[in-house]
């Protein structure tokens, strides 16, 4: 009788629920699926920053101007201005090759700002989230640094104009349009690429602080882009000296590019 009563009490007792272990949400490929917490949508890890910065730098350091000129049998570092950028390739190798160099250098900046951060986030199992603009700045700046100080050429690279334009195309497209308009206007008037590039950098450094050219809220993106414009101007120090002396070469529209044996200017 006592045993039967004990069994009845045990049966009437509410069943205790065992703890259910929730899956760990670590990225878009996690078991959480669409229930991924909002905080996991941003990448805060040092690994992500290192991967984005290093990959962008190595892409930016690819010396397309040097490689294109070498394919044409020219050492671009020994002719013209001895710069590996598109302008020297345009003058010393040919117009088409110079345009190709400009587009490829521009593509390096765009890849650093757009492709590399998104790919790094995907490979590491996350998304860029609300800080996408900051990661684009990181990748773009590292790409420009790679072009300016390429590890493949002993850290002696170009001036960063085309690569900066490509970076801005991914970060602040409206600012690119304004800077490009200023660059073209200055080039048509002066026929001097260096002067046009310097003026475009000045226009960018000023306009980037005001809508609709400002890429994001806060002071960091405009500050970084202003410093980048200052870097481009600083890389034109020799050109500024020649402009003041009146010896800076002008772009000759409609003329054939000089031979590789042309002495440096």
For the regions a language model picked out, list residue spans one by one.
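Cytosolic, membrane-interface loops and tails of multi-pass inner-membrane proteins
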Residues: 66-98, 241-265
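Multi-pass membrane catalytic core of lipid/isoprenoid biosynthesis enzymes
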Residues: 91-117
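Short, non-helical or kinked segments that cap or interrupt transmembrane helices
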Residues: 75-86, 152-165, 192-200
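Loop-to-transmembrane alpha-helix initiation sites
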Residues: 177, 193-201, 216-228
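Helix-coil boundary and interhelical linker segments in multi-pass alpha-helical membrane proteins
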Residues: 41-51, 114-138, 169-176, 210-222
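N-terminal signal-anchor transmembrane alpha helix
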Residues: 48-71
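Interfacial segments of multi-pass membrane proteins
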Residues: 90-95, 116-120, 142, 160-190, ...
């Amino acid at each position: 009788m006592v045993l039967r009563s004990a069994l009845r009490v045990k049966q009437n007792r509410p069943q205790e629920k065992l703890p259910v272990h929730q899956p760990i949400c670590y990225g878009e490929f996690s078991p959480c699926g669409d229930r991924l917490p909002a905080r996991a949508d941003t990448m805060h890890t040092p690994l992500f920053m290192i991967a984005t910065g290093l990959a962008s730098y190595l892409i930016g350091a690819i010396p397309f101007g040097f490689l294109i000129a070498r394919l044409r049998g020219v050492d671009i570092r020994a002719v013209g201005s001895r710069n590996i950028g598109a302008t020297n390739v345009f003058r010393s190798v040919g117009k088409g090759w110079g345009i190709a160099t400009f587009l490829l250098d521009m593509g390096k900046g765009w890849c650093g700002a757009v492709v590399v951060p998104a790919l790094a986030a995907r490979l590491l199992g996350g998304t860029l989230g609300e800080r996408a603009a900051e990661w684009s700045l990181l990748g773009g700046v590292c790409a420009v640094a790679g072009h300016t100080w390429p590890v493949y050429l002993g850290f002696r690279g170009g001036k960063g104009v085309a690569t900066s334009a490509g970076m801005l195309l991914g970060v602040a497209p409206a600012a690119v349009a304004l800077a490009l308009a200023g660059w073209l206007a200055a080039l048509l008037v002066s026929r001097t690429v260096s002067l046009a590039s310097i003026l475009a950098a000045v226009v960018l450094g000023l306009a980037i602080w005001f809508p609709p050219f400002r890429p994001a809220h806060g002071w960091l993106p405009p500050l970084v882009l202003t410093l980048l414009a200052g870097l481009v101007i600083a890389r034109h120090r020799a050109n500024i000296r020649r402009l003041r002396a009146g010896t800076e070469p002008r772009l000759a529209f409609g003329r054939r590019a000089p031979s590789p044996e042309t002495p440096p200017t």
